[in-house]
């Protein structure tokens, strides 16, 4: 080789300086990912060697144990990542490291055909991973030799990232590549042995290739003899992707240990779903359902979720792309063989494959929950206690699975009136009365408020079950779940009741007579209450309470109205109706009053009804004075 080709300085192509600046300051805001990217490239190189050696075993030379090594030198402020993979020739170095938008791995993939795609587990589609080194380094050196080449054909590449790089031919006995990062003082933290181990375990723990670091002995001296000794190496990653193994080879303890690692939880999981998928998409998913809710379950962006790997390399924990929000409690791993990534690997590309993977994961989770609800009711009760409130959000978020989600819902009801929600919609439908066509429910701000709602009185008299919905999310649930199994869901606190369906058809004439008898009282009450109510009418739903408030059949429930108002939404004008019980002594007494006492009685009756619905009084002090005056006679 002539002297002219021994050393040369070349300009980066494709406006590399502009792209480097963009990547360093925008894309790679999380600086520690440089190590993930370099280890990923090293893993690619080893995988490429493994594939090539299938046809040419001599490429292993005398070093068949494939590995990645990471070493820091705090005094020199360097971090070195070494692999004994395929390596690069001088031409490879210029082509692959001189252009930001090109990757030897990508070209390698393009040259493969047929089944070879399956065996070549490679990443590096866009070729910017290597340049993440400049996020922390002010100078980078690469020493490499291609497998099968002579030791004299080693190559040294060097650059400060400022627009040019130098390529030299050097003697190199070792096959593979060593990337040496020279760090400025501001990045000194990455020379710390423990810091590097922490990054490796965070991002590269499950790469199937062993990642080694020098053993740090407490009694290791600093004398020349100690420095001359060859370092002892130890594996710092697990070097085994547990989820890739057949289920028959994985113990329950193995599954639980992995869960605690990926979920940062001390408890064992409630259950898990492990699937190997091959076909148009090849991937493995191992999804866990925890026993208890994490502390950040209701935060906009939880700290943990489902980890996405591509060929055992951790990419992201951005669960939003992988599962809908109502399943944000799920933890685990999805490892894809062929999922494409965007240029920074920080976010997933908008790609139909992601949508397909997400849909399949949702289906498997719902399958598991259905199986648990049927065969393991105690475990399902644990799940519902922990995540039922979040899971209910799926009725609004996931219309495609609404029926399946509805089947998994659990409620309290008047059937037993216990606070533990264990009544399914199927249970309710199975207990419906002959001729009953609707599933009745009542919403409230607490279980006791729901159980004691005056709206339930007529239903109790006829033995008709009513679902008790005390969660704030229940208002959203019933706003999107209009029917189940062909039965309409109906609020007992909305509109006028179909009394014939409740077995009240024989009392129709008596009801009409009472409406006429109290027509004048209803009119007087309406005039006194004014715009507080839309109308006052005789109630046919009350048996024990003197009055209640009823919204229109198509209006928001009073609880929903309060939620929307608290969120700053403008609501359409409309007021509830006040229904009075003509058989109650308070109403009979009210009919005999007049003047100020009638007004006090009317306002007290209205405000008591408002309180029973969980509402708030505009002037509590005035209410107390009125009640005291009425008590005083």
UniProtKB/Swiss-Prot annotation:
Arranged from A to Z, the UniProt key words for this protein are:
ATP-binding, Chaperone, Cytoplasm, Nucleotide-binding, Stress response
Q: How does it assemble?
A: Homodimer.
Any coiled-coil ranges, and where?
Answer: none
The protein's role, per its UniProt record: Molecular chaperone. Has ATPase activity.
* Keyword Chaperone among UniProt keywords: yes
Q: Which domain of life is it from?
A: Bacteria
| MF (Gene Ontology) | ATP binding; ATP hydrolysis activity; ATP-dependent protein folding chaperone; unfolded protein binding
Region (B), start-end ranges: 346-562
Q: Where is this region: C?
A: 563-633
Q: Where in the cell is it found?
A: Cytoplasm
Name under which the protein is recorded: Chaperone protein HtpG
Return the similarity comment: Belongs to the heat shock protein 90 family.
By its UniProt entry, which InterPro entries does this protein fall under?
Answer: HATPase_C_sf, Heat_shock_protein_90_CS, HSP90_C, Hsp90_fam, Hsp90_N, Ribosomal_Su5_D2-typ_SF
Q: Name one GO cellular component term.
A: cytoplasm
- Tell me what organism the protein belongs to: Halorhodospira halophila (strain DSM 244 / SL1) (Ectothiorhodospira halophila (strain DSM 244 / SL1))
